[in-house]
């Protein structure tokens, strides 16, 4: 089962719905859920949803602090992506412009999360802030003309972040991105 940490984003139920559609059990939980309760669920992966504020990400940061206790793939979406970057020493700030539209991204490195996908995708973005500086030990997987770090991955751990929303129907191959993440989690 993949646990979805609800950071108050408008699309969190779409993550659950997409995973269910592709045959993956998942559960949305409040981001304030105690770590012991999350561990008791024995998740195969964790998704940090989008949301309005880095100050309201509950126990997501504690999951990263205690990663060895979970040792499962993590995917941060939008705010979750920014949280991962900030936690590992990257910089987050206002983008050149607020993005609430389709944006074309270029996949620089296929990696597991983008396996089998075209090099260019149109994706749905809904954010004002973005990762401005990559954290140490991370690599950029995708970029766009307006956002240089659209997707990133830890170099040694299965921790990913995407600035865009793969769960939104407007995102090309969004379902495939979530399917690839589920495969990393051993769910497919």
Swiss-Prot record:
Q: Which Gene3D superfamilies match?
A: 3.40.50.880
What organism is recorded for this protein?
Pyrococcus abyssi (strain GE5 / Orsay)
According to UniProt, the reaction catalysed is:
XMP + L-glutamine + ATP + H2O = GMP + L-glutamate + AMP + diphosphate + 2 H(+)
NCBIfam families found in the cross-reference section = guaA_Nterm (TIGR00888), PRK00758.1 (NF001975)
> According to its UniProt record, which residues of this chain constitute the active site?
78, 165, 167
- What does the record give as its pathway? Purine metabolism; GMP biosynthesis; GMP from XMP (L-Gln route): step 1/1
Provide the protein name.
Answer: GMP synthase [glutamine-hydrolyzing] subunit A
Gene coding for it? guaAA
EC number(s) on file: 6.3.5.2
**A Pfam family of this chain:** GATase
Q: List UniProt keywords, sorted A-Z.
A: ATP-binding, Glutamine amidotransferase, GMP biosynthesis, Ligase, Nucleotide-binding, Purine biosynthesis
Q: Which domain of life is it from?
A: Archaea
